[in-house]
Amino acid sequence: MKKICYVATIPGTIESFFIPQLRYLSENGYSVTVVCAYSDSLQIQLGGKVIFHSIDIPRGISFAGSVKAIQELTAFFKLEQFDLIQYSTPNAAFYASIAAKAVGCKVRNYHLMGLRYLGASGMGRAILKTIEKIACAKSTSIECVSKSNMELGIREGLFPREKVTVVWNGSTGGVDLAKFDYARRDQWRGEIRGELGYSDKDFVYGFVGRITRDKGINELLEAYFRLNSDAKLLLVGEIEDEQTLNQELFEKAKKDSNIVIHNAVSDIERYYAAIDVLILPSYREGFGNVVIEAGAVGTPAIVSHIPGPIDTIDPGVTALTVPAKGAKALADAMGGIRQEDYVNMGRSAARFAKEKFDSRVL
């Protein structure tokens, strides 16, 4: 039996993107092991067939933590003798690629979900880019989640073209059309709008993801307030690095009765259905799974014109694009999309998600 190991820094990465694939492999003749920080929730979700081994992989830059993580991974890989080791997220990729190469694992795949250094500057950017280069060099193959980020990585000198691939049309695992079921849109829309106090006639802009600067939250709030309209704004996700947010705008948002800031949810498909237009104004993204998930249930989007999100849409048909970090352009697009046939754009988004990102095909 072939032995496969998946490595990530935090349990959330596995929970959000990889559980269906891990279960599929474990049920079809492979021994599958997951390595990341410990989580009771992840242990339960993986079930009995996927092995879970806990190793704390530090986030950020920590010399002592780095040495310890590499030593622990090396010892574990040497003991288990995996046939394939795959890793995602920058720190996990850096440590695991070094350890996997050290023990002679023949297949070392970097599942590259985005380039963190693009959001940094100065010495920090240089260090993070070097970490990416080392992880790529130590890997036997690199799997990018979007074609646009693959091309960016080649231009940036991270890897040669012959070493990298994108599976089908990209994404971390496609979209589960049984979960993100367009046929249930009207039902879910009514349920969630009722819970949130929205009427069916209310126009609702939505954001799903980490509520932090690099996701474009400052620009989204500024754009929303520029509109000065009766539209609602629903933000679904955990607040992260609140100090990076524009405090004046964020405090104003928390006091605005037309804005709801909601914790992350497990049934996000129902919230996508309650939204009229999804907004993803990120500064950087590996792909932008939220766009194809929302699209699958019939919700069009406005996204930053950057590598990653541009692979998730058919411009002008399923979504609009705007420059990153441009609040005025975003406000114009948010106002403009209400004048277009956004309902038909949503139908097109559902067809696009089904044709391009069905997880069963991927």
Where in the sequence are the language-model features?
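A conserved mid-protein helix/loop that constitutes part of the nucleotide-sugar donor-binding site
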Residues: 15-20, 203, 207-226, 328
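Short His-centered aromatic/hydrophobic patch
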Residues: 87-93
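Short hydrophobic beta-strand element within catalytic cores of glycosyltransferases
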Residues: 291, 300-303, 313
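Aromatic "clamp/platform" in nucleotide-sugar-dependent glycosyltransferases that forms part
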Residues: 264, 283
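Short, structured helix-loop element that forms part of the nucleotide-activated donor/catalytic region
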Residues: 42-46, 232-258
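A short, active-site helix/loop in glycosyltransferases that binds the activated sugar's phosphate group
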Residues: 38-41, 138-179
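A short, well-ordered alpha-helix in the C-terminal region of glycosyltransferases
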Residues: 191-194, 343-356
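Conserved acidic donor-binding segment of nucleotide-sugar-dependent glycosyltransferases
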Residues: 314-316, 320-327, 335-340
